[in-house]
Amino acid sequence: MLERESNFKARLLAVMRLKISTLEPYHEFAGVLFKTAADPHSPLNPFAHDSAPVRRDSIRLFEGLVRDTKARIPDELRAELPYLLWLYHMGIILFWIHDSSAKSARTYRLIEQTVELLDKLISLASNPLMRPVRKRALKLVSELRDLELAET
């Protein structure tokens, strides 16, 4: 599907739905895994040094999503967007872990709504009036990532 689609919103929606549907068979065990992964010293922690290969693979998926989209994305945001989308997807997974609705309906609804918001925010990011806000936000992301790298 992604090979044929160049619309950012459609691409992100497809990836996020696929991520959750792939995890769905493990939903009953997700809480137990989360307890381990939430430990900052656990090798299963998604931010841990030991998790770097898995994290990089996931970020690469988002790199492809961003690279092959027709959306107008400022260059400095385009460089950071795969990492930001990875963080976003981690938040969605955390929500899904706690979602007790039938067939994770609340999670899918959250994905639909947040992908819509992200698409609009990314469109707004190209506006010259948003440049100072965009620069400030990306500087913060860079600083946080530098701290993360220093700790691993």
Q: Which residue stretches match the model-derived regions?
A:
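C-terminal peripheral helix-coil segments that are non-catalytic and often amphipathic
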Residues: 60, 98-152
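Acidic/His metal-coordination segments adjacent to aromatic residues that form catalytic metal sites
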Residues: 1-5, 65-75
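Short acidic/histidine-centered micro-motifs embedded in hydrophobic/aromatic stretches
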Residues: 32-39, 110-114
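Short, hydrophobic secondary-structure boundary micro-motifs
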Residues: 31-33, 74-75
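Hydrophobic alpha-helical connector segments
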Residues: 1-32, 39, 49-53
